[in-house]
């Protein structure tokens, strides 16, 4: 028996592909073209390094904050550790920015402050059944500090990230839901205090 494969070629925007799939188009493959290689929807990755702390001779850190006229752009000062908090089903509920050295434990209530100053509920409490630190040193003293994963392990890790670490609503192409990122009261206090010292206002 002969098998006929149907391909839809030429550059296709992702919205067009979504519409074709919704209409049950019978194509085996799509030629996305330069819409994929140029990341047409988000062609620029906005990543900027900013100084948040200075290490002192005794090994401790002094928090630093860049001056900004906009409270919404105020960076989070200090040496920090981000955590991921999970519910009883093993689903990630949110990420939490804590000061380095703060202890976040599973089974104990965690008070969190919403990064959005306009949020209806600025402070919430959640008891995670599991927690995981997200900042893992890969290079220490100029040397590799971890065992590099295999390609199969990388694929399994990404698959787990998409199924257990991310909500379905965060993956949709149109109006995706924001991933919740909160901060501990200690982080919020440090940020507000330093912003007030620099600008005389609240954040």
For every predicted segment, state its role.
Residues 1-7, 16:
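Acidic, glycine-rich loop-and-beta core segments that form the ion-binding/anion-interacting portion
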Residues 12-203:
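Gly/Ser/Thr/Ala-enriched C-terminal appendages of enzymes
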